[in-house]
Amino acid sequence: MAMPKLEVPLLFLFFFFFFLALTPSRAQTFGPPLVSPIQKDASTLQYIVTAYLQSQPQETKLLLDLGASYIWINCDDYNSSSYRHIPCTTLLDEYVGCFACLMNCRDSNPNCGDSVCVLKPENPFQPSFSGNEQYAPALVDYFSMLTVDNTGSIGGPSSSSPFTFIFSCGYKENLEGLARGVTGSAGLGRSSISIPVQASAIYHYPRYFALCLSGSKTRPGAAFVGTKGPYKFGRRIDLSKPLAYTPLLLNPVGKYSYPDLKKPSSEYFIGVTSIKVNGKAVALNQSLLAIDSGNGSGGTKLSTVVPYTQLETSIYKAVTEAFVKAAASSPFNLTTTKPVQPFSVCYPASNVRSTRAGPTMPAIDLVMHRNDVVWKILGSNSMVRVAEKGGADVWCLGFVDAGVRPKTSVFAGDPSIVIGGHQMEDNFLQFDLESMRLGFSSSVLSRGTSCASFRFAAKTG
């Protein structure tokens, strides 16, 4: 079914967003919250969500980028009759935070316009500040996802009342490094035009989203937007209960900062204050665990585009040494073997016992803002199975050395810890953007369920 032509004046659209964002009452919502399967691409280890875009909704695969500011899509192949550009020097231009203004491009296509706002397609697998950055027009167009009700029933993307979303165009060359079939990115970060914030503004959804990345090679996990729960997984277990909570911290220096202009990061940080291995605290340089307000370095970031947790060199050395020592002691009694890249600590698989929570290994505890708030990393998340055909079959500690304060941009420093996708798998994460806190479960495998157990039944509607 073709969508009606988008005729909403852009200035009105801005005030519509602004009014809804400031409305205190959220009792009335418009339609059920959003849900998407999260597929893991085996070759790139990237996580992929599904959305529906354009005037005649097309299923679109997007990279799940937890820290990105907004959606972007390859517009070289974008065929929609309903899109609109955002004019420069308007209130909406300021609200969106456009990078610049595109002038004198008069071809009739989404990637071209005269005096229109442009954004930067954010591809985390292409280097930033390379001197060859591309910008592309911002668009307003239809965007939808699957929906889910409180019983867990799945509905199809609505053709009668789709979302009107702001996002960025991109070009084919911006897809370099992305998984096959992916045509853009789904940004969930701290931004006025991220998916959860736009969905909340338009439809009065609570400013919540949740991720449950699957540890299965074949079955997807699930992403939820606009609901506090319940989140019904296998055996009808609601993963919103119980959760531990820790504040989401703002890094005041984002990757697009300059010496004379600091822009806050769109990425999510949490306050890890110590690390324990097998119940014993690891000696760390505490200054590395805090965010430096001057250059944004340090602290702990969450990332869905990093496959394995990255630790600053001194932290990595301390944690791995403590882990090897604990694994060598009773009741584990394990001896390391030749490592397999990119890991440095591995054990013969034949010597490792397994439970439903994964291989039996020393627990790694990330202690948050209070000593009783702990993200416990068990064997299913601390270890990675590497079985080479005709070669090694080992369990490896799934953490990597990030170097000594590496830089991702010219002016902003890197975090000391980046919690990667593998460590999040089969952990339920709820992002409460109203109270700016993270709810987390630790591994749900110990509860007899998994992130792959959410049922994406036949679509309706």
Please state what every model-predicted region is.
Residues M3-V8, L20, P24, S43-Q46, ...:
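Aspartic protease catalytic domain
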Residues P9-F14:
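Sec-dependent N-terminal signal peptides
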Residues F30-V35, C117-S128, S194, K255-S257, ...:
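Short Pro/Gly-enriched beta-strand edge/turn motifs at strand-loop
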Residues A42-G181:
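Signature of the N-terminal lobe/flap region of pepsin-like aspartyl proteases
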Residues N79-M103, R236-T246, A318-V340:
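Cytochrome P450 catalytic domain signature, combining two hallmark sequence patches
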Residues S128-P137, D141-E267, K301, L366, ...:
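Glycine-rich flap/beta-hairpin and adjacent strands of clan AA aspartyl proteases
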